[in-house]
UniProtKB/Swiss-Prot annotation:
Disruption phenotype: Impairs degradation of resistant potato starch, but has limited impact on less-resistant wheat starch and no impact on processed solubilized starch. PANTHER family: BINDING PROTEIN, PUTATIVE (AFU_ORTHOLOGUE AFUA_1G14430)-RELATED (PTHR36575), CHITIN-BINDING TYPE-4 DOMAIN-CONTAINING PROTEIN-RELATED (PTHR36575:SF2). Belongs to the polysaccharide monooxygenase AA13 family. It comes from Emericella nidulans (strain FGSC A4 / ATCC 38163 / CBS 112.46 / NRRL 194 / M139). This is AA13 family lytic polysaccharide monooxygenase aasA. GO terms for biological process: polysaccharide catabolic process. The modification Methylhistidine is found at H19.
Amino acid sequence: MKSLLALVAGNLVTAVSGHGYLTVPASRTRLGFEAGIDTCPECSILEPVSAWPDLTAAQVGRSGPCGYNARVSVDYNQPGDYWGNEPVVSYTAGDVVEVQWCVDHNGDHGGMFTYGICQNQTLVDLFLTPGYLPTNEEKQAAEDCFLEGELSCLHVPGQTCNYNPDCSAGEPCYQNDWFTCNAFQADNNRACQGVDGAALNSCMTTIAGGYTVTKKIKIPDYSSSHTLLRFRWNSFQTAQVYLHCADIAIVGGSGSSPSPTSTTSTATSTTTPSSTSCASAISIPVTFNALVTTTYGENVYLAGSISQLGSWSTSSAVALSASKYSSSSPLWTVTVDLPVGATFEYKYIKKESDGSIVWESGPNRSYTVPTGCSGTTATESGAWR
């Protein structure tokens, strides 16, 4: 069966141009896309490599654990202006949280995927240091650490963890600690898009529209003021692996690591209590940073599906501040106290000087407020679409 599908894949490879990337929590790739730097976030690809049936055979090379997009020559293994300088979300050790990636309609190659957290802070710090690009050897060492720190499907009580239907017993891929896509040639709910069964354009890709792929992971008993969550998808159809990472913080764990001393970001960082026990927050301040180019008289607002964001009413939308705006960095920002665990949709809008409203394009953005100790903060960054 695999040899037949490989032949079919070989005949189709020139037609397949879209793939997938981590969206929740916001990966470095997603932030690069929203900032207008990455024109094809689903196109960070490690290829050609041995991706199947041995899921860990491929060396990550230049792609590293965070991905390299050759289309735009962006290496996400080092911090940039719009990613890598601070956590995008703070989690509490032991929590079960929802994670999501986006697969393109034209590049749903089936296969299996996994998440990992490397608990070697010295290694991780190499990927948090502005101006430093880790070597290929350091990238591989980090990927090995992420594989060791796998966040297994089986760690989440009650979660269904199936074997991949395109993998036979006895093959290295016959394991259910990794998450699996559905059968590549299934008549209904095929491959990775079949995991959620979501509608086309339920998430954003630039080739043919995307489908969400949602699972749950359990945050390990570990603490770090800034670390990385790595996502890896091994394709069944093609000789490709997709790697992405998101900057996160973890509080409340028994194991801990010192804050990185090599980073020099002046952006507001997520605060984390030093105690391993803490009072849980009821709400946390979430800072929304949006890159929106405006003209004199225009103002930017945040409208969303919850009451704190006006329940989609433009007259009750939350105003952003342009106090940090410049021609080179058109930043609008606002901090809103939001209830922990709340999941909502939102969009940015412009209010013109004549009172007219302009909504940004594309599907609604989505966000889940993290849980954490009292004093925890979170940041969500994006760019006008």
